[in-house]
From Swiss-Prot:
Keyword Membrane: no
GN (gene name): IQD3
Biological classification of the source: Eukaryota, Viridiplantae, Streptophyta, Embryophyta, Tracheophyta
Protein name: Protein IQ-DOMAIN 3
Domain IQ: 107-135
Species annotation: Arabidopsis thaliana
GO MF annotation, one: calmodulin binding
């Protein structure tokens, strides 16, 4: 590199290019001379714009060559100055080294140089480590590290958010499960309470319980048969009189054609048991009261009608005896007054019940004692009832076809016996 540069400088400084440049103008002069001759001969025909352009280009080339020559001379001078400076520096170092350690041997100077070299090596090593630390610090505090740190923090944030959502979902599922188990437990407790309400706490055995249920079923069947028998007889009486009590039909069950009393009795099958001792005592007391009233009525009838041996008097007395209010009729009237009116397919204020009440009041007014004298209206009502003895007998039979109360047994033998006794007494009196 240095040799080529130095050779280039020598060529620039050599006189050969000057001679060539000097030779060239001679040739050109010859050529220019010839051309002038030609130009003169040709009288300006060869002169053209092309020659002008060539001249300009040559001038530019000459200027460039001059500039390059001047630059080469300057660089050569600079190189010579640099070489001289280097030689001078070497001489200065040599002289300074000799003058730095005056009065010392070569061995001491060598040791000093070795120490300085080693110290320089250690200093360069420390400098290299320091540069590494600076470079590491720049890397740590650089943009890449910051970008990595931000991405790591974002990923950690998303991970924490996902963990929180999963934990919240688990808590919600556990709460829903607890609520579901609580509802199932409440439902189970309700079912258990319901089964406990229907539990039979009786100390009876299974056979006894089944026997009681069978007896109840048999009793209900007998009761239904008795009611059906009474209903069939009631239909015959209604067909004969055409004035029976009002029955009510159920559109869903056409065979359910009983009166409201029979249906009320059928709706309460467990209350129609046999007579208890209390009911028996009540029945006996009621019979004694009825017989006492009849015994009081008969002698007073003798005093009231001394001329009662005529057929008309017998005719009037016989219906009176038949229309004596018995215990069953009283119970029917009291039951009709106490029965509520809001039962299905029943009308408490029906026409047959009011007619039965009127007949009962008329019969009761005729069987009063002597100190309660009947009025003219009562006598007229009695005469009207005497005109239709057949209907009064049928109404009495109709009342006797039912039981006196829902808790007592039917009695069909009471009123006919009274009627027979009274008729016998009337015949004896006659």
């Amino acid at each position: 590199m240095g040799k080529s540069w130095f050779s280039a400088v020598k060529k620039a400084l050599s006189p050969e290019p000057k001679q060539k440049k000097e030779q060239k103008p001679h040739k050109s002069k010859k050529w220019f001379g010839k051309s002038k001759k030609l130009d003169v001969t040709n009288s300006g025909a060869a002169y053209s714009p092309r020659t002008v352009k060539d001249a300009k280009l040559k001038e530019i080339e000459e200027q460039q060559s001059r500039h390059a020559y001047s630059v080469a001379i300057a660089t050569a001078a600079a190189a010579e100055a640099a070489v001289a400076a280097a030689q001078a520096a070497a001489e200065v170092v040599r002289l300074s080294a000799l003058s730095r350690f005056p009065g010392k041997s070569m061995e001491e100077i060598a040791a000093i140089k070795i120490q300085t070299a080693f110290r320089g090596y250690m200093a360069r090593r420390a400098l290299r480590a320091l540069r590494g630390l600076v470079r590491l610090k720049s890397l740590v505090q650089g943009k890449c590290v910051r970008r990595q740190a931000t991405s790591t923090l974002q990923s950690m944030q998303t991970l924490a958010r996902v963990q929180y959502q999963i934990r919240e979902r688990r808590l919600r599922l556990s709460e829903d499960k607890q609520a579901l188990t609580r509802q199932l437990q409440q439902k189970h407790n309700k079912d258990f309470d319901k089964t406990g309400e229907n539990w039979n706490d009786s100390t009876l055995s299974r056979e006894k319980v089944e026997a009681n249920m069978l007896n109840k079923q048999v009793a209900t069947m007998r009761r239904e048969k008795a009611l059906a028998y009474a209903f069939s007889h009631q239909n015959t009486w209604k067909n004969s009189t055409k004035m029976g009590s009002q029955t009510f039909m159920d559109p869903n069950n056409p065979h359910w054609g009983w009166s409201w009393l029979e249906r009320w009795m059928a709706a309460r099958p467990n209350e129609n048991h046999s007579l208890t001792p209390d009911n028996a005592e009540k029945d006996s007391s009621a019979r004694s009261v009825a017989s006492r009233a009849m015994s009081e009525m008969i002698p007073r009838g003798k005093n009231l009608s001394p001329r009662g041996k005529t057929p008309n008097s017998r005719r009037g007395s016989s219906p009176r005896v038949r229309q004596v209010p018995s215990e069953d009729s009283n119970s029917i009237v009291s039951f009709q007054s106490e029965q509520p009116c809001n039962r299905r397919h029943s009308t408490c204020g029906s026409i047959p019940s009011t007619r039965d009440d009127e007949s009962f009041t008329s019969s009761f007014s005729q069987s009063v004692p002597g100190y309660m004298a009947p009025t003219q209206a009562a006598k007229a009502r009695a005469r009207f009832s005497n005109l239709s003895p057949l209907s009064s007998e049928k109404t009495a039979k109709k009342r006797l076809s039912f039981s006196g109360s829902p808790k007592t047994v039917r009695r069909f033998s009471g009123p006919p016996k009274l009627e027979s006794n009274v008729t016998k007494k009337d015949t004896n009196l006659a």
